């Protein structure tokens, strides 16, 4: 029989929607030689701000 382990849901991340500007937007980010540029065209649904799409 394998040993039992305890899993805690709060370890690592919290579920839910976070404001984009608080979690991903870094205005003072400096690019590195290893960075890869990827571009996507996104059309927000009605009522969704463009920066949140």
From Swiss-Prot:
A GO molecular function held by the record: monooxygenase activity
Highest rank taxon of the organism: Eukaryota
Major subcellular location class: plastid
Sites of N6,N6,N6-trimethyllysine modification: 14
EC nos: 4.1.1.39
Propeptide stretch(es), residue numbers: 1-2
N-acetylproline modifications at: 3
Location(s), subcellular: Plastid, Chloroplast
Biological role: RuBisCO catalyzes two reactions: the carboxylation of D-ribulose 1,5-bisphosphate, the primary event in carbon dioxide fixation, as well as the oxidative fragmentation of the pentose substrate in the photorespiration process. Both reactions occur simultaneously and in competition at the same active site.
Note: The basic functional RuBisCO is composed of a large chain homodimer in a 'head-to-tail' conformation. In form I RuBisCO this homodimer is arranged in a barrel-like tetramer with the small subunits forming a tetrameric 'cap' on each end of the 'barrel'.
Protein name in UniProt: Ribulose bisphosphate carboxylase large chain
Originating organism: Malus domestica
């Amino acid at each position: 029989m394998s040993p039992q382990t305890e899993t805690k849901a709060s370890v690592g991340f919290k579920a839910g929607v976070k404001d984009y500007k608080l979690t991903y937007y870094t205005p003072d980010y400096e690019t590195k030689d290893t960075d890869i540029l990827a571009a996507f065209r996104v059309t927000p649904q009605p009522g969704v701000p463009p920066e949140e799409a």
